[in-house]
């Protein structure tokens, strides 16, 4: 019977191509507007490390002003001090631990006529690549011994390697930054976590850094942080050493804990550590340590802007308006086909058969509207990309994956079927006797 209903649906759409076209257009425009915003929000709220979400934790310690919290109502600082990050790293109580910050350096490419350029560099401890499942194309990262020895090694992204060395295996070659030599030990494969969950400061949609160096080397070289730096009181001593010994927060810390028992043990370790520091005159506030999963941390830092949520609500309302128009068009179509419906009822067609026929026809219109809606969504995303072309990160936010394509088609079908329920019910209520008597 499905083939028969599909055939009747095709004939009905052809016989009323204008009304059918308007319904497809209404659904496509509504789906396009809605899915454009849904896609942007989907990318913004994506968790690039979801498969390890229950194992990775962002560390927060509340070393802030005793009189005022870092953020209301009682949020601890989003970063940690050099003193605490290095002490916790050295303790090694987690399966893996990462401390890192970003810094601006001047890259000096090989060859005459190639101008130096400024580049943001991620200075991090050795576990960064293993903890965050960073893929390598050539070589590997450095180890903890290289961290302790402050070896001048570096890892390049695939795009930076192509820019500097023509995409060949550059392991063992030399990179010059700020007149200092670094030996390339690894080149990443394609890796673009968006948002950059491991550091949500500044703009989390700029994408990951292109160059990575050991944390200890950056500190010894007195590299400044190009990320957020916050202090609740000035350093007691001047210079870089005074900055390292201060209560200023500028380092992101993550730990990998394999199960709930390890998480509880590490949380207790943090409490014990802070209590020890209190005896030394630090941490004037009450215990307020936090361990947040990547998903929880992104919610905490409000990665999805409130404006996007408002736009999503407006887009859904616009889709509802389009569906109301579709309902009106379907009702008009039912009224125009009243004689045909009455004749079929008089010849023995049951209400259930009519219902199935019109639902199948509505589904066909929904599929067509969904496919057209995908095209409208693509146009909407390209429009956003063109309007905000000056922002380098915008290309990451306007990417439509297969999940969104499937959602668009499913939403179109469900919307069309939902819009068809009332007109179909009205069609089934048509009295064949009264209609044919009038004719």
Labelled PLM ranges:
Residues 126-141, 152-300:
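Mid-to-C-terminal secondary-structure elements
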Residues 404-439:
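C-terminal membrane-exit region of the final transmembrane helix in multipass inner-membrane proteins
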């Amino acid at each position: 019977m499905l083939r028969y209903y599909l055939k009747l649906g095709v004939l009905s759409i052809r016989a009323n191509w204008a009304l059918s076209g308007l319904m497809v257009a209404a659904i496509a425009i509504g789906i396009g507007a809605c899915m454009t915003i849904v896609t942007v929000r989907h990318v913004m709220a994506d968790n690039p490390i979801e498969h390890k979400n229950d194992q990775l934790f962002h560390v927060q310690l509340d070393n802030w002003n005793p009189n005022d919290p870092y953020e209301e109502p009682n949020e601890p600082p989003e970063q940690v001090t050099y003193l605490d990050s290095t002490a916790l790293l050295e303790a090694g109580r987690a399966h893996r631990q990462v401390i890192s910050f970003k810094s601006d350096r001047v890259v000096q490419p090989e060859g005459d006529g190639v101008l130096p350029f400024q580049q943001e560099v991620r200075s991090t401890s050795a576990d960064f690549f293993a903890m965050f499942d960073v893929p390598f194309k050539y070589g590997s990262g450095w180890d903890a011994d290289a961290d302790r020895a402050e070896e001048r090694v570096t890892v390049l992204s695939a795009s930076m390697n192509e820019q500097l060395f023509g995409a060949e295996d550059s392991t063992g070659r030399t990179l010059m930054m700020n007149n200092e030599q670094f030996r390339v030990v690894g080149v990443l494969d394609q890796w673009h976590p968006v948002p950059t969950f491991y550091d949500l400061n500044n703009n989390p949609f700029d994408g990951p850094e292109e160059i990575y160096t050991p944390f200890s080397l950056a500190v010894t070289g007195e590299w400044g942080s190009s990320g957020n730096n916050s202090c609740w009181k000035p350093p007691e001593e001047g210079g870089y050493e005074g900055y390292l010994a201060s209560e200023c927060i500028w380092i992101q810390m993550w730990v990998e804990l394999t199960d709930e028992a390890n998480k509880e043990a590490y949380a207790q370790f943090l409490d014990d550590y802070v209590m020890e520091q209190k005896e030394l005159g630090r941490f004037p506030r009450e215990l307020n340590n936090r361990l947040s999963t990547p998903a929880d941390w992104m919610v905490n830092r409000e990665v999805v802007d409130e404006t996007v949520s408002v736009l999503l609500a407006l887009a859904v309302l616009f889709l509802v308006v389009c569906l109301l128009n579709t309902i009106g068009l379907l009702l008009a179509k039912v009224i125009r086909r009243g004689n045909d419906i009455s004749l079929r009822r008089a010849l023995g067609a049951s209400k259930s058969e009519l219902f199935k026929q019109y639902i199948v026809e509505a589904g066909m219109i929904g599929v067509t509207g969904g496919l057209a809606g995908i095209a409208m969504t693509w146009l909407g995303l390209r429009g956003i990309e063109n309007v905000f072309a000056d922002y380098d990160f915008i290309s990451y936010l306007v990417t439509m994956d297969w999940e969104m394509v499937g959602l668009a088609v499913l939403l179109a079908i469900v919307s069309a079927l939902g819009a068809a329920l009332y007109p179909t019910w009205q069609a089934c209520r048509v009295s064949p006797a009264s209609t044919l008597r009038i004719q």
